[in-house]
């Protein structure tokens, strides 16, 4: 998967196209990511011990990883991700600037 938790990404398709946010969680088996403030859905909750009132909450829903692009740390623009072997480590590299993403 080309994005990881903590990456800054931009949504390229869908109802939140053009918005950007930080990846809160990645689900590689499902090819989905959870992004802060993106793809908000209303979740209806029953009253419980934690939330005695119950009600409707706004929460983020995961979106498919193909709908997001990583933001290049050097230029601040969306970029594709490549991989290079540096020493004995495989690192992610921004295609636009050549900047190494993994530190």
UniProtKB/Swiss-Prot annotation:
PROSITE patterns: RIBOSOMAL_L24
GO biological process: translation
Keyword Transcription regulation tagged: no
GO cellular component term, pick one: cytosolic large ribosomal subunit
Alphabetized GO MF terms: rRNA binding; structural constituent of ribosome
Matching SMART domains: KOW (SM00739)
InterPro entries, sorted: KOW (IPR005824), Rib_uL2_dom2 (IPR014722), Ribosomal_uL24 (IPR003256), Ribosomal_uL24_CS (IPR005825), Ribosomal_uL24_KOW (IPR041988), Translation_prot_SH3-like_sf (IPR008991)
Tree of life domain: Bacteria
Keyword set, alphabetical order: Ribonucleoprotein, Ribosomal protein, RNA-binding, rRNA-binding
CDD domains per the UniProt record, alphabetical: KOW_RPL26
One Pfam match: ribosomal_L24
Free-text function comment from the UniProt entry: One of two assembly initiator proteins, it binds directly to the 5'-end of the 23S rRNA, where it nucleates assembly of the 50S subunit.
Assembly mode: Part of the 50S ribosomal subunit.
UniProt family annotation: Belongs to the universal ribosomal protein uL24 family.
NCBIfam families, alphabetized: rplX_bact
Protein name per its UniProtKB record: Large ribosomal subunit protein uL24
Organism listed in the record: Listeria monocytogenes serovar 1/2a (strain ATCC BAA-679 / EGD-e)
């Amino acid at each position: 998967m080309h994005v990881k938790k903590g990456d800054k990404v931009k949504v390229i398709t869908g109802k939140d196209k053009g918005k950007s946010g930080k990846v809160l969680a990645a689900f590689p088996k499902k090819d989905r990511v959870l992004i802060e403030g993106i793809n908000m859905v209303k979740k209806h909750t029953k009253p419980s011990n934690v939330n005695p009132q119950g009600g409707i909450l706004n929460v983020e829903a995961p979106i498919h990883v193909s709908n997001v692009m990583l933001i290049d740390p050097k230029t601040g623009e969306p970029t594709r991700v490549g991989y290079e072997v540096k020493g004995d480590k495989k690192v992610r590299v921004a295609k636009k600037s050549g900047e190494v993403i993994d530190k």
